[in-house]
Design a protein with these regions (language model features):
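Bacterial N-terminal signal peptides
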Residues: 8-27
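Serine-hydrolase catalytic machinery in alpha/beta-hydrolase-like enzymes
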Residues: 35-63, 69-165, 265
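Short alpha-helix in the alpha/beta-hydrolase fold that links the catalytic acid
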Residues: 112, 231-241
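Short beta-to-alpha linker loops that shape the active-site pocket of alpha/beta-hydrolase fold enzymes
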Residues: 128-132, 204, 257
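Primarily recognizes the serine-hydrolase "nucleophile elbow" in alpha/beta-hydrolase
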Residues: 158-216
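Short beta-strand/loop motif that positions the catalytic acidic residue
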Residues: 215, 221-223
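Acidic catalytic loop of the alpha/beta-hydrolase fold
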Residues: 226-230
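C-terminal catalytic histidine-bearing segment of alpha/beta-hydrolase fold enzymes
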Residues: 243-290
């Protein structure tokens, strides 16, 4: 083939390849592969709710608990304040880091922290917002702001882990719900070998193998089969990455349950699924932290 004809053929092939790539980028398949908008999904799930704790959410701890506000570090010159709950009259022992849901540290999260403390854990509810949301719209904005600055959130979580270690924690786990479920997973990434167990309730997954390489702890996940905002298939992809590299992730999927099925203050509360998940979470934490 003459040289000019060869060049022309190569140019034509390159143009065709670029056109194909452009077509794929604009195709429905490419759109499906884009990262989901979890903030919008959370707004859809919680848009008709309020941050107020229902009477059912105020489940009393099994044993006496002491709760107080503590400063667990600083970030960009601002004090990081969280709620510390622990069995009355105790110091040290196994500890849990509990990131809040998308409302911030409200009464529901305080009750959750106290309930885990009633099971014998020192519990630190960390504040990733620096405030609480009063409406779904303000919660969505706080959620989006936090996810736009993940490095700051991870430094926040790292400060909480360091504080628990200095306070005498013999082992540390992380438990979170919704937005907090995603951040309990990130606590596992940040903490490395310092975090011995991660429990995720319907939290957004991370499927990138490089990002998950930091995770050393076993993971348990609790998800509703009807959750369209965080589909079970997306979480199974994370599970596949973890198990494929020799780590452990156990999933419990509840038929008929939706997102936030374990939140007694929410419209999707499913008492049967929530009770089952609670028992399984406690067994998982006991096996890995005690």
């Amino acid at each position: 083939m003459p040289f000019r004809a060869l060049v022309a053929a190569l140019v034509a092939a390159l143009v065709a390849a670029l056109a194909t790539v452009a077509g794929l980028a604009a195709s429905p398949l490419a759109a499906q592969q884009a990262p989901p908008d979890y903030a919008a999904a959370m707004h859809a799930a919680h848009g008709s709710e309020t941050p107020s704790a229902s009477p059912a959410a105020r489940i009393q701890p099994r044993t006496a608990v002491t709760s107080e506000v503590v400063t667990y570090g600083t970030l960009d010159g601002k004090a990081l304040k969280g709620v510390l709950a622990r069995p009355s009259g105790t110091q040290g022992g196994p500890a849990l880091l509990v990131p809040h849901e998308w409302w911030g540290i409200n009464d529901t999260i305080k009750a959750v922290a106290a309930r885990y403390a009633g099971e014998g854990y020192t519990v630190l509810a960390v504040d990733l917002f620096g405030t609480t949301a009063g409406t779904p719209d303000s919660a969505m904005k706080l959620y989006q702001a936090a996810m736009r600055n993940v490095p700051a959130g991870e430094r926040n979580v790292a400060a909480a882990i360091a504080w628990l270690k200095q306070a005498g924690a013999t082992s540390i786990g992380a438990v979170g719900y919704c937005f907090g479920g995603h951040w309990s997973l990130r606590a596992g990434l940040v903490g490395g070998t310092d975090v011995k167990a991660v429990a995720i309730y319907y939290g957004a997954p991370i499927t990138d193998a490089g990002a998950l390489a930091r995770l050393k702890a076993p993971v348990v996940g609790f998800y509703g089969a009807l959750d369209t905002g965080i589909p079970v298939d997306s979480v199974r992809r994370m599970q596949s990455v973890l198990t494929g590299s020799g780590r452990t992730m156990t999933m419990h999927v509840y038929d008929g349950a939706n997102h936030a099925f374990a939140n007694p203050s929410g419209r999707a509360y499913d008492a049967k699924a929530a009770d089952d998940a609670w028992g399984k979470a406690l067994a998982f934490l006991k096996a890995n932290l005690r």
